[in-house]
Amino acid sequence: MTLLEPIQGRPDTAISTAELRSRLDDPDLTIVDVRPMAAFNGWRLRGEARGGHIPGSVAFPSAWLTSVDEAEIERQLADRGIVAGRSVVLYAYDPAEVAELEARLAAHGLTDVRIFDAGWESWAADPDLPVDRLANFDKLVHTEWLRQLLDGGQPDAFDGGRFLLFHVNFGVPEEYEENHLPGALYLDTNWLEDPENIWQRRSPAELDRAVRSLGITSDTTVIVYGRDTEGDANEKWPGRRAGQIAATRALAILRYAGVKDVRLLDGGYDWWVRAGYPLETVRREPTPVESFGVSIPQRPDYIVDIDEAKSILADQAGSALVSVRTWKEHIGKVSGYNYIGPAGRIAGDVWGNCGTDAYHMQHYRTVDNTMRPYPEIVANWAEAGITPDKRVAFYCGTGWRASETWFYAYLAGWERIAVYDGGWFEWSRDPLNNPIEVGVPQDEFAAQAGSGQAHPGGPPPGARGPGPSRTAPRTRTSAGTAPRPIP
C-alpha cells in the first residue's frame, strides 16, 4: 500500500472525510483509533505528514485483541464507549487491523460500525484537518525508535548527538547482569536518592558526582527503562520489582538536575523482549565526564519540599497537592509500605489514584503495561479538579509513583508541575505540625451517597475509564542484594 492509498472498506460501511470531520463533536459517535499507542501519541510510524490522532478518538490498539482475554476485551470496549447502540467509526494504518476489530464488534452486537476508508495517512496529509497529539510525545519512545537509534540510524525526533541508555532499578545489579538491552548501562536509583534521608533526592553536590560518574552531561540524551517483575508487596524491598516506576523516578531527578533531554522507553524491558529484539549480558561500565556542564539544579521547580507543599495546600483555588496512592492508603487503612508506620493522608490533598498497591501503576497504564491514553489520564484529573492552569504537585510515599504521574503531566505539556519529594513518609513523621486525615473525605462520601452505590473499600464511584489492568506482562528475577553506594 502506498503512503496515501485509501483503506478499502465496504461501500455500506465507509464514512467519508467530509462526514467524519462534520461529526467530530457528535456525542453519539465513538471514533476508534486501532493503531499502536505510539502512533496515537504522535509518532509518525509510517512516515505520514503529521503524527497524532483524529480529535476525540479513543485508543483501542488492535494488538489488544490477541494479547488479553475476552473478558478484558469486553471491559476495555465498554470503558471506551464501544458498545451496542453506539455509532462507531474505526480507522487505522492497515486494513487488516480495522477488519479484525470490525468483526469482533459485530460479534458483540454492534451494528452501526463504519470504516474511515481514506485512512489515517490521508487525514494527516491534509493541513486543514485537525490533529491532536501528546504535547511531548517524543520523550516517550517506542521500541522501534530505540532499535533504530541503537543500530546507528537517525530516528524521528532525534537530532543526533551523544546518547546513553540506562537499565534502571533499585539496588538489583544482578537483574542487569542477567541480561539487558544492547548498550545499556546500569543505574541504581540509590545513586540519585538517599536511603539515609527517606529516599529524597540527593544533594546537588552528590547528584553532580553521580551524573558525572555515569558519563551524563546536561546535553546528553538519556533514555531510561525498567523491568517490571513478579513479587509480593510484603517482601523486604518490593520496590526492586517496580522497574518502570524506578525509571521515571530517575528521569524526574535527572530533569530536575538539568539534563535537557531525558526519555522513557514505553513498556520498558518487557516491550523490547516482546518485539523480539536482542538482549545482551555484557556488563558495560560508564565513561565518567569531568563536568556536567551546568550547576545543579537547573529545574528546582520540578521537585519541591515540605514548605512548598504547604504553600500549595494553602492555595486550594489555584493549586493541587495530588495523592498518587491507593484508595486504602488514602483513607488510612494501610500506610502502603512495610517501613512506614502511620496511615492516612495529607489534609487537603486530592486523590489521584495509582494502582493495586504502592508498587503498581495500573490506573495510569494500559492492559499491556504502556502509558494509558493521555486523554483518559487528563480527563480523570479534570474530574478531580486537577487541571493544567493550576500549580500541581504529586506525592506518594517516597516519590516514585509521584514521579511517574509527574512525567505524564510533563508529556501532556503541563508546565506548573512538581513532585513533593518527601511525600507521605516525611509528612507523617510530624503529625503535630503536619495535619493528617483518615476516613472517606466528605466530598467523596457525598458523591458515594448521591450515587446510591456501596463503597466497599475501593475507589469512589464515578471514576472514569478503565481501572487496574489484570494482564500486565510480568517476568521473574532475583531478589537482589543490599543497595550499593553512589559510584
Pin down the residues of each PLM region.
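Cytosolic catalytic domains that perform sulfur/thiol-centered chemistry
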Residues: M1-P487
